[in-house]
Structure formats: C-alpha cells, structure tokens
Swiss-Prot record:
Cofactor annotation remark: Binds 6-hydroxy-FAD non-covalently.
Family: Belongs to the FAD-dependent oxidoreductase family.
Residues carrying N6-acetyllysine: K168
Annotated protein name in UniProt: Ferroptosis suppressor protein 1
C-alpha cells in the first residue's frame, strides 16, 4: 500500500479520532497514500504506553515514550477534545466550537486506565514526561510498595520495580488466582507467577483490596494500611493501581448509542465498519472484536480500515478482518518475559529479544518517521 491513490480524492477527507497505536498507523498509511486526512487527539504527542511502566521506574526513559504528532503529520494534526459526532452533517465536533468535516471517519479512541499504565490527560509533552519522572522519585523513596491488580499491567509493573530496585519489598494483590490475561495459555500464566516469585514479589491472590478508595495513589507516604476482603493487612509506603481499564467512549457515545456493546465498544462488521455505517470504522480498543485489547491488534485493524477506505474509493471488494491465533508478549523487566506467538508458548530469550529490552519503542518512532532522543 505504499503507492499513492490514483482516484480523485477531492471528495474524500478522513478524520481519525484518537492518536494511539491504531490512530497513528492509520494516519501514517493515509499520509503515504496521499489521501486527505485529519488526526485529532487531546494530547500533543503520541504516547507509547507499552513502555509506560518502565518509564515510571527508570529516570530519563519517559522522553523516549512521547512522540510529537505535529512533527510527523504537520497540518494534518489537530490537538483538541472531541465532544461529539454530528452524523447528519458528517462533522466531528471539538470542545471550543470547531467542527471537522469528514467523508470517512476512523474511531480509534482507545481505552483509559490508571496512571502510570495510561496517560490520558490534556497535556503538553513536557508535562507528561515530568509526570513520569515524578513517579520515579516516589518509587525510589518507597521501601514497601503494593501493586493492586494482577492482569498484564500489574504483573509487568511488579516485575519492573523488582528488576530496577531488587531491594524493595513489592506485594501484588489480585482478586483471582491465575495472573495476567485470561486469553493466555495456562503455561504462560503459570510462568508469569514463577517469574514474579523468583524476583521476590509477594503474592496475595484471591483477595480484593477493600479500602482502595481511601488510599493515596502513586505517592510516597510514611505509612499506608492496605486492607483486603479476607482480613489481610499490608503496611506499605506506596500504592500503585493497575486495574480498571475502560473503553474511551465519550467522543461517540451519544451518536452511536444503539451500536454500543455493554463495555462501550462499538459493534462492527467483518470489515470493521460500525454497524449500519459504510463510511465509519472503529479500530483498536474501541472496536468490539473478540480478542484482547492490544497495540498489535490496533495496528492490524488500521491496515484493514485504510485498505477498505481506499477500496471503497476504487469500487473494489472490501477486506475482512480475521482475528488470528493470539500473539501476546509479557515483558517482566528488561531481562525477562514470557508469552505466546500465534498461540504457541515462547520463553524468556525470545520475549527478551522481541520486546523486553526496548519495549517496541523503536517501532513507534519508525511509524512516526522520527529519530528517538
């Protein structure tokens, strides 16, 4: 798809809402094809949040995880918050009154969750980087740290802390017994547990934090008491929450109320078109596809959405998206990891080479056609 589109693009203007992994992949492809587009995001920089947890333990790392949109997309980027979509007039409505017309719309709004795993604030690049540098200082001050939530973010967070600061006491509290994501092979989930135990992480499984709302988050305190529903009490200096990921649906919720899945994702057909709309696509976390929410999948969705916009312009058949066997790599600190590729177990060496060392940062800088600092 590297050559430019030869049909008349005068009537075509694609608006992409959300500049996460799916959004920048779609924007880069449209730019290469010379298809008119506008990318909208409330931040001024792409956040490579796959590496967010390392940025919260290693000073100087965060600057590699934020990449300027305007340096890549120039006038095809608009910083702003989308507050609604006018389907009748084909307009994306921004806070402040601006309206962006579209012939085709790609919704790539992603998901939100607690800092440091996600950073979803209206912010400039410098302030975002500083938020992670401040987090590093809080972790460095704390001898005892509790991580709440044993999904992939929680286990990676605990592993990153123990890799960078092996002398710290880290306790991971998880409401279930198996760790990481339920779609993973049982042997992968077991290896996650063994890696954490080898690193010296204390595991409190099948327990739920009962006083979470009262606890300070991401800040050093001389004494914090964490209580669980089983009556366990843990004394700590710092609490990091790594659960509660939600789909970012506020931009489109009112326009597509009848097209929403129970979690707020958009119901799509096999071509990733929002049900009932041939010119509107949903990709990444906000698409209701039967697969885990991952950056890798968002990129695959972007390929299909862009191909289908081009195919529709050329009156060609549309391309269907077919989820494959699961590829999922868990980085457990820079020297360790485990996962599966196309449904098959892969161990430490492969994951370390493929992901753990640089957490795929170079891939995002390449997509954005910029050089890392």
């Amino acid at each position: 798809m590297g050559s430019q589109v030869s049909v008349d693009t005068g009537a075509v203007h694609v608006v992409i809402v959300g500049g996460g992994f799916g959004g920048i992949a779609a924007a880069s492809q449209l730019q290469a094809l010379n298809v008119p587009f506008m990318l909208v995001d409330m931040k001024d920089s792409f956040h490579h949040n796959v590496a967010a947890l390392r940025a919260s333990v290693e000073s100087g790392f965060a600057k590699k995880t934020f990449i300027s949109y305007s340096a890549t997309f120039k006038d095809n980027f608009r910083q702003g918050k989308v507050i609604g979509i006018d389907l009748k007039n084909r307009m994306v409505l921004l806070q402040g009154g601006e309206a962006l017309p579209f012939s085709h719309l790609i919704l790539a709004t992603g998901s939100t969750g607690p800092f440091p795993g996600k950073f979803n604030e209206v912010s400039c690049q410098q302030a975002a980087i500083q938020a992670y540098e401040d987090m590093v200082k809080q972790i460095q001050r704390s001898q005892f740290i509790v991580v709440v939530g044993g999904g992939s973010a929680g286990v990676e967070m605990a592993a990153e802390i123990k890799t960078e600061y092996p002398e710290k006491e880290v306790t991971l509290i998880h409401s279930r017994v198996p760790l990481a994501d339920k779609e993973l092979l049982p042997c992968v989930r077991q290896e996650v547990k063994e890696i954490l135990l080898r690193k010296g992480v204390q595991l409190l499984l099948s327990e739920r934090v009962s006083n979470l709302e009262e606890l300070p988050r991401n800040e050093y305190r001389e004494y914090i008491k964490v209580e669980t529903d089983k009556g366990t009490e843990v004394a700590t200096n710092m609490v990091i929450v790594c659960n509660g990921i939600k789909i970012n649906s506020s931009a489109y919720r009112s326009a597509f109320e009848s097209r929403l899945a129970s979690n707020g994702a958009l119901k799509v057909n096999e071509f990733l078109q929002v049900e009932g709309y041939s010119n509107i696509y949903a990709i990444g976390d906000c698409a209701d596809t039967k697969e885990p929410k991952m950056a890798y999948h968002a990129g695959l969705h972007a390929n299909v959405a862009v191909a289908n916009i081009v195919n529709s312009m050329k009156q060609r058949p549309l391309k269907a998206y077919k989820p494959g066997a699961l590829t999922f790599l868990l980085s457990m600190g820079r020297n360790d990891g485990v996962g599966q590729i196309s449904g098959f177990y892969v161990g430490r060496l492969m994951v370390r080479l493929a992901k753990s060392r640089d957490l795929l940062i170079s891939t995002s800088w390449k997509t954005m056609r910029q050089s890392p600092p």
